[in-house]
Amino acid sequence: MQFIALTSIGIENLLVDELTELGATVSKQTVGSVRFEADSLLAQKVCLSTRFATRVLMLIEEKEGVDDKNSLYNFARSQPWQEWFGPTQTFAVDFNGTNDSLKNTQFSGLVIKDAIVDYFNDLFEQRPNVDKQDANVRVVARLNRYGVSMYIDYSGPRLSERGYRQGQGKAPIKEHLAAALIKRSGWLENVNQPLFDPCCGAGTILIEAAGMARNEAPGLFREGFAFERLPSFRAAKFKELKEELLGNIIDPKLWLIGHDYDAQVLGKAIDNAKRAELDDIIKFKQSDATKLTAVAKLPGVVISNLPYGERIGSMAELVDLHRNLGVGFKKHFNHWKLALLGMDESLFKLLKLVRLKRYKFKNGPLDVELNLYQLDDKQVSLTTDDKKALNFEGSMSFANRLKKNKQGLKNWLKQNEITAYRVYEADIPEYNVAVDIYGDSAVIFEYAAPKEIDEKTSEKRLQDVISLTAEQLKIAPENIAVKVRKKQKGEEQYTPMAKQNRTMVVEEFGAKFKVNLFDYLDTGLFLDHRLMRRYIQENAKDKRFLNLFAYTGTASVHAALGGAKAITTVDLSKTYLKWGQDNFDLNNISNTRYRFEQADCLKWLEHATAQYDLIFLDPPTFSNSKRMKDAFDVQSDHIKLLTWVKKILSPSGTLIFSNNKRGFVMDEVGLIGLGLKAVNISDKTLSPDFKRNKKIHNSWLITHG
């Protein structure tokens, strides 16, 4: 009988060795799978014993030239289905693969389903029912460029789901991948040596390690396998097999230690260990991996699935973690072996360790790599006691500028009650970032590097920027958000991650605003508009104020605090309007004439008839809008936009027009044609923290001529 064992990319060689050790004959290895020959009892032993396979399928038949509906139907119809189930049982069909004729996997699955139903109708005048969730038998078909392979699901649900893990942390590791790390680490060569995971999360690596060291077949305590529903299954033989495997379990002296800083996740690890009946073997402790200390007097092996940065803005924490891990390992883990899993090569380099070997894997959809290190005397001697060792000595120029800029803003910040401000704006060309402070937190925004700058050099400089920002500004790494521009699939973009939902309140000129530094590209407050908002507050008394493209309504808050008699806040985003209402609540603002309207601002202008005495217009540089035949571009379309706004600007009203397009040129002729006049106030709207970047925005006061 032929079977195929499925696994994840990178684990195939380990699976081949495992199958061979179990007595199976391996006939073919491909990406993500291994084909082997075995009798039914040996195949059942594989299902019970495998640490590396995720699923085992039994081959029914494979045939070349099956490439359309008719040939697929005939191929499925010709199989002796009564050998595997009867007309009173249920079945399901999984189909994988497409071609020019079979373009839809669901349709192809239905073709096979129809063939099976017709087969039983002809043979028994009775048909089995389909049960997609809990079928007695699951048929699996795989289409490739040569033809179709037909299988019966032999193992059932994922073999990697051992049953002990009901709780997990962020970025969990799959059990079969954890087993692969343990095997590759070399720890199994001497299971009496300590095994330590400083970022243990839900404890998966340690629980897998204990099971492997005890020679425990992971499927022994599984509730059931798909093969138990097949006619060929012999319960007595299977019982004997399980008793044999139970007898193979040993009880070595194990020294397993797991640390994690997250008490909640650590609680899940403890619960998982209890379910695996290993809670008396594995010792868990809440501890910060950035402050490593010795965990054993004898050297052992460190195996850890390091954090990947699964949350946007967590890069600062990752840089801090890896730099401190490197120092901690060298100080307290001499003669230990390290096996560390991660995604980012540049972060591994922060360990300042010479890699012994590297293995590439997949953790779900993520490309990850396992790096092996040997902490011998030579490795340890490479370090210094300075945990903030920089990639470049020249990075201290950034640190000095950061410190100087902050000191220079100190009096101005205090006088104006400002707690959110820019402290660095690409002052030094090599350090092409902006750094904004928000209370006890910060945002580092990386600008696109020139093409001639090597990407790895930029990464290293950014790492230094992160460390020095934390050090010089005395901000905890977990409170530093980093917005990094990276190339992905040919496009340069900022990639959002899972949201943290962390908000805080900042102040300016007596106003309070809610900001979110981690979940979006922008924070909820455009710092460069600060003086425009103050102008609005100072000139809003008893006026009708309109805020277009309002974002989180911060200008509207200032208008309200300035005594505006009516305020209309318009934005397309429901999220941002709700945010704006939160800002009103923060400032105890309540008035029936203060309205929020969700709308496309260009579309809204088409129907607007009310008059406004003070208007703030801050359109995007570029946008798609149903109001425009083509996409909106502020340079080419600003006169058209001002034409619409003019209609609702009261005779003595003032329009504050601003945009962020570099090199923007006002169409003065077009403006005169509209009967409007404009005064450029760009320089006057730059507060001290933005004086270093005079091109941050363009702004005008526009009135009727």
Swiss-Prot record:
It catalyses: guanosine(2445) in 23S rRNA + S-adenosyl-L-methionine = N(2)-methylguanosine(2445) in 23S rRNA + S-adenosyl-L-homocysteine + H(+); guanosine(2069) in 23S rRNA + S-adenosyl-L-methionine = N(2)-methylguanosine(2069) in 23S rRNA + S-adenosyl-L-homocysteine + H(+). It is found in: Cytoplasm. InterPro entries: 23SrRNA_methyltr_KL, RlmKL-like_Mtase, RlmL_1st, SAM-dep_methyl-trfase, SAM-dependent_MTases_sf, THUMP_dom. SUPFAM superfamilies: S-adenosyl-L-methionine-dependent methyltransferases. The keyword Transcription regulation does not apply. GO terms for molecular function: 23S rRNA (guanine(2445)-N(2))-methyltransferase activity; RNA binding; rRNA (guanine-N7-)-methyltransferase activity. Gene3D superfamilies: 3.30.2130.30, RNA methyltransferase domain (HRMD) like, Vaccinia Virus protein VP39. Its main location: cytoplasm. The keyword Mitochondrion does not apply. Keywords: Cytoplasm, Methyltransferase, RNA-binding, rRNA processing, S-adenosyl-L-methionine, Transferase. Its EC number is 2.1.1.173, 2.1.1.264. Transmembrane segments: none annotated. HAMAP family: 23SrRNA_methyltr_KL (MF_01858). Belongs to the methyltransferase superfamily. RlmKL family. Specifically methylates the guanine in position 2445 (m2G2445) and the guanine in position 2069 (m7G2069) of 23S rRNA. This is Ribosomal RNA large subunit methyltransferase K/L. The gene is rlmL.
